[in-house]
Amino acid sequence: MSELEATIRQAKEALAENNAKKALKILKPFKSSLKKENANNVILNEVFADAYLDNGQVEKAYPILARACELDPEGQVGGPDKFFTMGQIMGGQDGVSIITRGIMNISNTGGEMLTNVQVEKIVGGLLSVIEIWMTDLCMEPNAEEQCEELIQKAMELTEGKSPETWSTLGSIKISQQKFGEAYEAFSQAWNFFELKKQEIGSGINENGDTTQKAGLQSEYVDLLQPLLSLTKMCLEVGAYEVALKVIAAVRDIDEDNIEGYYLEGFTYYLMSKLEIFKLNNPEVSLRPENIYEFNQLIQEVPLDLSHEPISQLIYDSRLALSFALQAGVNADSKDEIVQELLGGANALLQEIGGPLDPSELTQIKKGDLVNENEDLEELDIEEEYSD
């Protein structure tokens, strides 16, 4: 194995461990060669682009990624992933075109006997194209038709078993204001995410091969963002119990995930507001449609913190938001997303009684104190309007 091959392998291993800075450090000796003797090396261009992207340096990744796509137009050397990444960065009609090129490359290679990996990549490409149609191209007259056609293809390819496809379907239904159908789609998404998480977890525990195990661990961590996105979409249609199950899965993967804690606290906050609304408006039949409307008017619902029916919900909200603040103590002050989450957690806590004492959080973390809610039956809030 040459020095270059060893470097590429080590850099890929670092990226699999979600350590982009380490990967860039490993690659540094070959940086200047990208403009000289290794200018036409597809794999080196790809791994440099991946490292820059994972490190949040899109502007540095873009020209290198474009070069890789130019050098390997059929994806025969480095595979199709670069086309999907490039298309997502570009967006618009150009983005759709280059992602479609990647999809066609896989289809031409696999023919009628596509492997599971090839199907997964094609579906990922289809969902990326849908995202572009729902954002950059949403004002085009055929946008809705394109989304419907593409999601149907994705469903057919995965036999209706892809959690990501169900999540995207739910997002489409929200855009169409079909909130009941969105609710059902998100419930299905969670069912299949749960199965996927269990399968990957079992593979990690049972696999003795170090390389394969590292790959599975990377897949496990990769579930975080789609799960967090699903949580946020569940909240839009009042699928609160589903959201809490998804958040529990997030915690299994990353115990100190700040966004997960924030979303958990926000979910309980919404549930407490909804409980007050129900008590004050018993004649209203709650459904995903008016839960969506309710979310738009959430600030107008006053909270009485002494009101017994919501006391446990308020406590659970304070608990999760307090953990979010605790997890953010050592966060990068320049990370705008994290700082926004911490600001949101602080704002909610001011409304519901402030953070819990750090000593109480420590005891709960150790298991010395049990959250009272664990001994209560699950609230049936959403069942009343999910039919």
UniProtKB/Swiss-Prot annotation:
GO terms for cellular component: cytoplasm; mitochondrial outer membrane; nucleus. Its main location: cytoplasm. Residues 363-387 are annotated as: Disordered. It is found in: Cytoplasm; Nucleus. Residues 371-387 have a biased composition (Acidic residues). It comes from the Eukaryota. The modification N-acetylserine is found at S2. One of its GO terms (molecular function) is protein transporter activity. The keyword Amino-acid biosynthesis does not apply. InterPro entries: TPR-like_helical_dom_sf (IPR011990). The keyword Cytoplasm applies. GO terms for biological process: 'de novo' cotranslational protein folding; protein import into mitochondrial matrix; protein insertion into mitochondrial inner membrane; ribosomal large subunit biogenesis. TPR repeats lie at residues 42-75, 163-196, 224-257. Present with 1630 molecules/cell in log phase SD medium. Interacts with RPL4A and RPL4B. Acts as a chaperone for the L4 ribosomal subunit encoded by RPL4A and PRPL4B, required for hierarchical ribosome assembly. Shields ribosomal protein L4 until timely release and insertion into the pre-ribosome is possible, once ribosomal protein L18 is present. Belongs to the ACL4 family. This is Assembly chaperone of RPL4.
